[in-house]
Amino acid sequence: MPKIIEAVYENGVFKPLQKVDLKEGEKIRLRIEEGIADVIKEFSRKVDQDVLEEFLRERR
């Protein structure tokens, strides 16, 4: 069953931010997705500041 696990990429290695139930040396597939903060940063250059602030208020 697929699981979503957040990880940080440091020095060429993906480091999970939570405990994972894997055996040493087990191979897995990774699907890399941008986080919402990364998406907002990308579009903030294209969106009026007032519109961005309204969007962030609605997301809370």
Swiss-Prot record:
SUPFAM superfamilies: AF2212/PG0164-like (SSF141694). Disulfide bonds: none annotated. InterPro entries: AF2212-like (IPR008203), AF2212-like_dom_sf (IPR024069). The keyword Transcription does not apply. It holds the Pfam family AF2212-like. Belongs to the UPF0165 family. The keyword Amino-acid biosynthesis does not apply. This is Putative antitoxin AF_1087. The lineage of its organism: Archaea, Methanobacteriati, Methanobacteriota, Archaeoglobi, Archaeoglobales. Possibly the antitoxin component of a type II toxin-antitoxin (TA) system. It comes from the Archaea. Keywords: Toxin-antitoxin system.
